[in-house]
């Protein structure tokens, strides 16, 4: 739902930051722009990653009917050194680096899916769209070792599996 909304409302090639999970589970699956995919391939090659990882990126890149984006991952404490993963960030850096959109995935009932409170405070007032699966008073129950956001009980409080996705548009001028 969120990926489809982004593809319909955000121009191809736009710079999008995804916050704040180390896992890609739960984030909208967006296609990389050709330039972003080439940059990642080059950096992964220098880091010694195999052809399998390259092929994964190429498969994403080949979905030509879908728009591609320059994706940045916002992850505090990440020390990977990749240009697309930022461990230090705030609204000023996002503006300086011309990030137009921020996509935040979070889920209050799972430890691995929390937003960054300092960035969340800075993004107040920039919200454009939210996809929230929580609909009722029932609290969903999860297998703590499962990263797929599929409840095992407490379904009365859910409209769908997955985290809450919030999309923000930042004024980069």
Feature locations, PLM:
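Catalytic lumenal/periplasmic loop and adjoining terminal transmembrane helix
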Residues: 1-172
